[in-house]
């Protein structure tokens, strides 16, 4: 986004939605604004809970809201990244408004997760593809995407890591007013959204194992707007 802003040939419109706007997920749109990135529109999907029915209803709200914005600005292309379910409404809206879609990080595989179907659906709705490596590029072509529209550009997050000024342990301790133990474990748990109830049992097993690591500092990453995310969050909070 920052590189596009530097190029006078491009005019970008940033649309922010879903968990970025939710207070319980940290209202992370403020981080976008603090990076001096202008947000053109904030679209709330009004997600009331982590139940499948509420997530499904929020997609309908998204299609209506995105259609209104895209019809007004009618960009030359819509750029999306990844496999978040919230991308489907904007892709459907773009398709029906005859706006081409560019998709980053297609062709990947996450078995056991709804992300698998979502990602491949977005790829089939898209016109230009920017996968992260040659394996993913070949998979897109095998799915029927035109080879001359598939560009292996590598993982864009690598540039973010390379250019980011990383914090040292002491800075984190001061900021959060904590003291790390000598050994640290970083834990991320992603529910298998196809079988969410099974995932909760799996998380309980993980926590039972982690309970044995008394001499470690355990850092859990937060949840996103996924099925059963509230249950995951509650289990982790009770554990810590």
Task: Give the predicted meaning of each segment.
Residues 1-5, 45-147:
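Active-site and donor-binding regions of nucleotide-sugar-utilizing enzymes
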Residues 11-58, 65:
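Conserved nucleotide-sugar phosphate-binding/catalytic loop shared by glycosyltransferases and other
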């Amino acid at each position: 986004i920052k590189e596009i802003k530097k190029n006078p040939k491009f005019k970008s419109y940033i649309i922010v939605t879903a968990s970025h706007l939710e207070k319980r997920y940290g209202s992370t749109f403020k981080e976008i604004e603090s990076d001096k990135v202008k947000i053109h529109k904030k679209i709330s999907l009004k997600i009331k809970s982590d139940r499948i029915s509420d997530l499904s209803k929020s997609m309908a709200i998204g299609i209506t809201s995105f259609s209104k914005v895209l019809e007004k600005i009618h960009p030359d292309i819509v750029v999306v990244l990844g496999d978040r379910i919230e991308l489907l409404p904007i892709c459907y809206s773009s398709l029906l408004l005859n706006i081409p879609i560019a998709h980053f990080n297609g062709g990947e595989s996450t078995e056991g997760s709804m992300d698998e179907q979502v990602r491949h659906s977005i790829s089939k709705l898209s016109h230009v593809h920017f996968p992260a490596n040659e394996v993913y590029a070949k998979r897109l072509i095998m799915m029927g995407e035109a080879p001359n529209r598939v560009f292996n550009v590598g993982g864009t997050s690598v540039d973010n890591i390379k250019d980011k000024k990383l914090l040292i342990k002491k800075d984190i301790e001061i900021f959060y007013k904590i003291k790390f133990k000598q050994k640290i474990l970083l834990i991320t748990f992603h529910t298998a959204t196809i079988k969410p109830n099974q995932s909760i049992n799996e998380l309980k097993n993980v926590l039972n194992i982690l309970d044995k690591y008394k001499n470690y500092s355990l850092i859990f990453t937060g949840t996103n707007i996924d099925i059963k995310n509230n249950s995951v969050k509650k289990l982790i909070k009770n554990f810590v």
